């Protein structure tokens, strides 16, 4: 049996935040347990508030049609993150002090 990738949504404390592709739920759900993801989400902010803190609840579900569209638009525009994630929200700009 051949599976086609499905688009999934990661919710943080009930808010749809990221969309990404995975073949099956088990594969999609693994992202919730990745330390690098929690670190990245803790560094990204909205209105100067981190997206994710230590006690944030992360949940995976199938993406809704509007979220699928946003993911596909980001993929077509080559605006996915290095990890092939599409943010579904507007983030604060990343400031670099180099």
Region locations from a protein language model:
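A short, exposed loop/beta-hairpin motif centered on an aromatic-Gly-Thr core
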Residues: 14-23
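A broad, low-specificity signal marking well-ordered, structured residues that form hydrophobic/aromatic
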Residues: 8, 20, 58
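Solvent-exposed, well-ordered amphipathic alpha-helical segments
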Residues: 2-4, 24, 62, 98
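Short, mixed-charge low-complexity intrinsically disordered segments
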Residues: 36-98
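Short aromatic-glycine-(Arg/Gly/Cys) micro-motifs in beta-strand/loop hairpins
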Residues: 2-15
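Short, conserved charged micro-motifs
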Residues: 26-30
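Short, solvent-exposed secondary-structure boundary/capping segments
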Residues: 32-34
